[in-house]
């Protein structure tokens, strides 16, 4: 660490892949980084399983599902799973807390207490507007990509409100695929 004296705190953005896919190159790299962070004073790991808002790529599950809904097309799920999606504004609040708190936790998961399957999220999207679309699940089965809930004193907007706000913004823009 040749430049260690140039900063007082390091914040790394981890991934659930370091837990659920450590055999992949991406998961292995995230695991190595997480282990390095654990061993280094004043280094911190903010683990993200999934993050969403209206600015995410149109290919990401939540935005793609909202856009399909707005276009009156069925939503697509490859394999249903329990998945932790964290609202971007809540992630910003977590990062802000790390920047301003004297001794933040060494590691946190950006994960809400309430867990949702992809099919439940699609059903929630279906309830946000005035029509209904189909929900196609391509492959049977259930897995999870989820972590222990965030344990920090940070005011959070939460998943449901974040989903509603994202839907409203995309709906107001008249966004289409």
Segments the model singles out, each with a brief description of its role:
Residues 1-28, 44:
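Conserved Rossmann-fold NAD(P)-dependent oxidoreductase catalytic core, especially the SDR/UDP-sugar
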Residues 1-6, 36-37, 94, 98:
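Hydrophobic positions on the long internal alpha-helix
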Residues 15-18, 50-56, 115:
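Active-site proximal helix/loop that lines the substrate pocket
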């Amino acid at each position: 660490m040749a430049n260690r004296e140039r900063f007082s705190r390091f914040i790394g953005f981890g991934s659930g892949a370091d837990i659920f896919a450590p055999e992949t190159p991406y998961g292995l790299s995230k695991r190595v980084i997480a282990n390095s962070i654990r061993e280094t004073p004043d280094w911190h790991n903010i683990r993200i399983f999934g993050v969403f808002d209206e600015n995410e790529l149109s290919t990401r599950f939540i935005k793609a599902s909202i856009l399909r809904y707005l276009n009156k097309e069925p939503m697509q799920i490859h394999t249903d799973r329990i998945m932790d999606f964290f609202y971007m504004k809540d992630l910003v609040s977590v990062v802000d807390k790390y920047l301003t708190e004297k001794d933040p936790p060494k590691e946190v998961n950006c994960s809400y207490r309430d867990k949702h399957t992809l099919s439940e999220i699609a059903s929630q999207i279906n309830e946000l507007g005035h029509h209904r679309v189909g929900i196609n699940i391509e492959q049977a089965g259930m897995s999870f990509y989820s972590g222990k809930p965030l344990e920090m004193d940070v005011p959070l907007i939460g998943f449901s409100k974040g989903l509603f706000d994202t839907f409203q913004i995309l709906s107001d823009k008249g966004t289409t695929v």
